[in-house]
C-alpha cells in the first residue's frame, strides 16, 4: 500500500526541513523539478577553499517524499564534496531503479526512501533535493575555477 511509504520518520523529516530558505550570496544554485508531480527544490551553496559545501540553504515545495529527501540532504550537505554528493545520487538511483542498498556515509539517511522503489511515479520527487544540490555544487565549482584562473592570469 502506498500509505506504507509515509512512515513516522518520513513525515518527521518532511515536517522539519533543515536549512530552509535561500542564501543571500550563493556561489551556486541548483533547481530540480519532478515533472510528474511538480515537486521542486532550489538549493543554494557556497564552497570552502577545498570545494566542500561551506553553506547551504534550500527552498523546497514538494510532497512528503521530496520533503523527506530534502530533510536528509539538509542534515548532510555541510562539509560534503561533489564526489560524495554524486556518489549518493548514483547510489540512490540504483536503490530506486535496480535494488541497490542506497547511499552510505553522510547521505545514508536517504535509505529511508528505499521503499519508494516500488512506486516509480515517486522516484523523481524523492530525487529533487540531491539532484539540485549536485547542480548547485557543480555551478559553484565552475565559478571557483573561473575565479582561480582569473587570479592566476592577473598575477602573471
Model feature map: region roles:
Residues 1-21, 30, 80-156:
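C-terminal binding/interaction regions
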Residues 37, 63, 125:
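Functionally engaged cysteine thiol sites
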Residues 42, 51, 74, 83-87, ...:
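Short, surface-exposed, polar/charged, turn-prone segments marking secondary-structure boundaries
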Residues 60-67:
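Short, thiol/selenol-centered motifs that function as redox-active sites or metal-ligating centers
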Residues 69-81:
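Alpha-helical support elements that line or immediately flank enzyme active sites
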Amino acid at each position: 500500500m502506498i500509505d506504507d511509504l509515509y512512515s513516522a520518520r518520513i513525515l518527521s523529516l518532511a515536517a522539519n526541513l533543515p536549512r530552509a530558505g535561500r542564501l543571500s550570496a550563493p556561489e551556486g544554485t541548483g533547481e530540480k523539478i519532478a515533472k510528474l508531480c511538480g515537486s521542486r527544490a532550489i538549493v543554494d551553496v557556497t564552497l570552502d577553499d577545498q570545494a566542500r559545501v561551506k553553506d547551504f540553504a534550500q527552498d523546497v515545495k514538494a510532497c512528503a517524499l521530496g520533503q523527506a529527501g530534502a530533510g536528509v540532504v539538509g542534515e548532510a550537505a555541510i562539509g560534503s564534496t561533489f564526489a560524495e554528493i554524486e556518489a549518493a545520487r548514483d547510489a540512490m538511483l540504483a536503490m530506486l531503479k535496480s535494488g541497490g542498498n542506497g547511499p552510505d556515509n553522510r547521505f545514508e539517511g536517504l535509505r529511508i526512501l528505499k521503499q519508494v522503489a516500488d512506486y516509480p511515479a515517486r522516484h523523481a520527487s524523492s530525487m529533487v533535493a540531491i539532484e539540485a544540490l549536485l547542480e548547485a555544487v557543480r555551478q559553484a565549482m565552475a565559478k571557483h575555477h573561473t575565479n582561480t584562473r582569473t587570479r592566476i592570469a592577473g598575477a602573471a
